[in-house]
Amino acid sequence: DHHQSTDEPSESSKPCCDQCTCTKSIPPQCRCTDVRLNSCHSACSSCVCTFSIPAQCVCVDMKDFCYAPCKSSHDD
């Protein structure tokens, strides 16, 4: 069976952020400081990764909002 490609992002690549910091300016400037392995989330346009294996990647986009937290299904 062959996989049909769709534009729907997979659940794991949906933009989300657990550690988001914003400035107090109007509009706020928000940056996600989550570290992900090998890639950034699907909506990231500026992804910076280390050269280690696995690579540790951080999205350096500046937004005026924070994405929803990633850890929704694993509440302690």
UniProtKB/Swiss-Prot annotation:
The record marks 51-52 as: Reactive bond for chymotrypsin. InterPro entries: Bowman-Birk_prot_inh (IPR035995), Prot_inh_BBI (IPR000877). Gene3D superfamilies: Cysteine Protease (Bromelain) Inhibitor, subunit H. The keyword Disulfide bond applies. Disulfide bonds join 16-70, 17-32, 20-66, 22-30, 40-47, 44-59, 49-57. HGGI-I, HGGI-II and HGGI-III are produced by proteolysis of the N- and C-termini of HGI-III. Transmembrane segments: none annotated. One of its GO terms (cellular component) is extracellular region. SUPFAM superfamilies: Bowman-Birk inhibitor, BBI (SSF57247). GO terms for molecular function: serine-type endopeptidase inhibitor activity. CDD domains: BBI (cd00023). Belongs to the Bowman-Birk serine protease inhibitor family. This is Horsegram inhibitor 1. It comes from Vigna unguiculata subsp. cylindrica (Horse gram).
